[in-house]
Amino acid sequence: MTPVSGEGRRRIGESVLRKEDDRYIRGAGNYSDDINKPRQCYATFVRADIPRGRILSIDTSAALQADGVIAVLTGRDYADDGHGPVVHRAIEGDPIDFRTPAFGGDDPVALQFNQWPLPVDEFHHVGEPLAVVIAETASAAEDAAELVTVDIEHLPSVIDTRQAAAPDAPQIHPEAPGNLCVHHRRGDEEAVMRALAASDTVVSGTFDVSRVAGGQMEPRSGIGEYDSGNDQYVITAGNQGVHRYREMIASALRVENERVRVICPDVGGGFGPRGHVNPEFVLLAWAAKRLGRPVKWTNTRIGSFISDWQGRDWVLDGELGMMRDGRINAYRLRLQGNIGAHTICYAPPANASRLATTAYDIPNASQELQVYLSNTLPVLPYRAAGRPEVHYVLERLIDMAAAETGIDRLACRTQNLIARDRMPFTTPTGLTYDVCDFDGALAHVARLCDWDDFENRRTEAQARGRLRGIGISPFIESPVGAPFEMARLEIDADGNTRIFAGTQNHGQGHESTYAQVVSDLLGIPFEKISLAPGDTGELPIGGGTHSDRSMRMMGTLLHRISKDIISQALPVAAKLLQSPEDEVSFGDGKFQASGNQDGTPEVSILDVTAALAEFPEFRKSAATGLVAVAEQKGRINAFPYGAAAAEVEIDPETGEMTLCNFCIVNDSGIAVNPMIVHGQVHGGIVQGVGQALGENVIYDTASGQILTGSFLDYMMPRADQFPAFQLDEIYVAPDTPADTNPLGIKAGGEAGTVPALAVVGNAVLDALSPLGIAEMDMPFTSANIWKAIDAAART
């Protein structure tokens, strides 16, 4: 049976225009700040202006006298009301989370510290909330916040990774000696050292990966309410998963999960950091109950730079041994990550550690992972979390080794790829890839970027006084995410079909792709299907949207649900067809009976729901036509992979760099909507290239102040900096199916980001190589490039 839509064509695989785009384009989206409640008041936060200190006293008297002020609340008020810290707990039994016994046995690999929404004693970073001011208007609250005086004892701080790791560094938490919250080793280091010693060429380097801000289009915003009749807190806020927010907020308020309801309207960007609750949302819920009124807050853009979770921030030391024929013999890696002031999530170091050898067959590999606390904003997953970083360091080292040996960079990579006939392949870090054709992907992208003709383009650029370079890289992902999910489907008598999902749409096109799957499997018209907003009141559990998991998880659940719906509808369809059930089958979106007598050749699912009133014995609910629920326990593994190439041109007089070309192929499995996958890959490229070329959160290491606190200082990528990307068709190798789920889905949302740092960085260094420049830290801004050129000219 090949399920098709009622219109007689498949919906899975069709580039349908996104349902949600119409309202977004018309400005009719419903974001958190668009929502208002009767009698609402407004909150703003008094924030720490130094990186670390002890609160001696908070004087709120002047603020309380200001016009329109309702209350000024402190951490002492919060604690006195019986509330506690946010518990950023691990998922029990998760075998890939450093914090669980399932990973580390009885001796946890990672330390976990809880986070007070309003600290009573010590605070740990610039921008941390110290008090909340609530007033009748937002402007009144902001003005009054300036009147709050906080008496602080300054405490010594550490800002960057090297400071935190220094032997004499101030200790941020007494439970974390040396500021170290993770120290973990993988591989046989002694064997690696022997293999390095036996290698013909050994290259090494230290590579800094910059810290980035999320830069979401929509600043964080939310409304807290308290429903006294149901004794329930209600928080409406944009996020990446309402159920995780509910759990974290409930942990802080010290109530059962059922007493917290989280609703998510439209979301203007997530990228990872919005998958974990921020303290402000806990405080909105608490203040709403305390005051008996809804409390609303919307962050400012400058406020976002000093209070939103951030991403990346690594120091990577690598050493690569290569034999004379270009075969990689050994690889040793030390990863040092800066997790910031609070241990909210360990996914980035976990991902980096698991994928350290990427797409290569390296016989001897070891790594040491160290994660440090610092007095900076917490670092959380940011698009592709941990994967771009390890690709970057290994690809840089391969280019360096190729330069040392004189071996062509593409040939050097090709001969070291994990061969297709060795799948499934277990890496030195213990990760087992299922089916990947790395050689095919790399060859495909080499054709796309016209690798063989590049030297002619370099010569032509030199004639114009320009420097031209190219970088190429295979890549591999291992998207994981929460190991559980739930979905529900309801079809009413009029055929209106509603999907309830534990995932959370924030730009991925779920309203369209989920509808395409249901339309394809059940034959329901695409236009009749809608996706409900995220709401913990609708589903008891959900995993949220992160780590390229949503379509794989929801596709699996919608497939199960469709089977359930067909099973439920079968008895009614048989009645309508006046045939025994065992003579009725479902195919092509219709029920059909062999040998029916009344001339009715087929019955649709919507015919069944319309007729259910005549057959009450088959109805599950008086209010619903057909309803089905499905739950997934455990991750659905996938290994999307591909290859990418970037080509750049540099003006040596000014350092100005132009990205001339970016090519990528990606085996994302079956694409439910190829246009949406293309869009996701485009966005991923921009975020990866944006970091390589300019994005960089800069802290003053002496004062702890963020120096890039606005878009005047923080360089966001612009459309005019990018060429037309070459994606070709979505690359799906015919013999690399994703058999872990019924729809054959892998992932595509992070593909553009994973290789971007590596291919852009190597392209820049390749362009500069005629000047003798072999090393340079990101970001590769025009200023940094010019400084490198100038320094090379002076030596």
Specify the residue positions occupied by each region the protein language model found:
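Flexible, low-hydrophobicity surface segments
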Residues: 1-177, 202, 290
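Glycine-rich loop/linker segments at domain edges
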Residues: 14, 20-23, 95-113, 178-222, ...
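Extended active-site and interfacial segments that coordinate phosphate-rich ligands
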Residues: 22-23, 146-159, 240-242, 247, ...
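C-terminal catalytic domains of large/alpha subunits in multi-subunit enzymes
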Residues: 75-76, 96-101, 108-109, 254-259, ...
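Short acidic, glycine/serine/threonine-rich loops at helix termini
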Residues: 82-88, 144-147, 215, 237, ...
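Conserved catalytic cysteine-centered active-site region
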Residues: 112, 120-122, 256-264, 287-300, ...
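Short glycine-rich loop/turn motifs
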Residues: 120, 218-223, 315, 469, ...
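Thiamine diphosphate
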Residues: 270-292, 296-298, 510-518
